[in-house]
């Protein structure tokens, strides 16, 4: 790791349809081989499906799904005297968002529906209702942190 100053954060522009920067981050994470227009159409079509399925504002549903997946604590490995402990650590706000986005996309890709927009819509709808693989991933992370609460004094 460089000892110079940290790299400056790039400004992320809001998306075209909703004017939301978090949605742009989501699209950027979904994008494969630089095909942003494909990622945009997948996300917008998925949000339309979520709107018809849940009968509510698509952006509001997206943010609720993201909030339901965001972890508050995670475990990090810490070596102390030859033993490696899983130390529970609170997750920074930026990382919470990044993890939630990553987990939602990974969970959607693993689903069995035919198209990616169907999978993404189903996963977002499930996350809105506190179900689904992405929410389970958050629960598992919290359980791990809770199980290793005894090592929380090893924080750094």
UniProtKB/Swiss-Prot annotation:
Entry-linked Gene3D superfamilies: Ribosomal protein S7 domain
Keyword vocabulary terms for this entry: Ribonucleoprotein, Ribosomal protein, RNA-binding, rRNA-binding, tRNA-binding
Organism in which the protein naturally occurs? Cereibacter sphaeroides (strain ATCC 17023 / DSM 158 / JCM 6121 / CCUG 31486 / LMG 2827 / NBRC 12203 / NCIMB 8253 / ATH 2.4.1.)
Q: Which GO terms describe its biological process?
A: translation
The protein's assembly and partners: Part of the 30S ribosomal subunit. Contacts proteins S9 and S11.
Give the family from UniProt. Answer: Belongs to the universal ribosomal protein uS7 family.
This entry's Gene Ontology molecular function terms read: rRNA binding; structural constituent of ribosome; tRNA binding
Protein's UniProt name: Small ribosomal subunit protein uS7
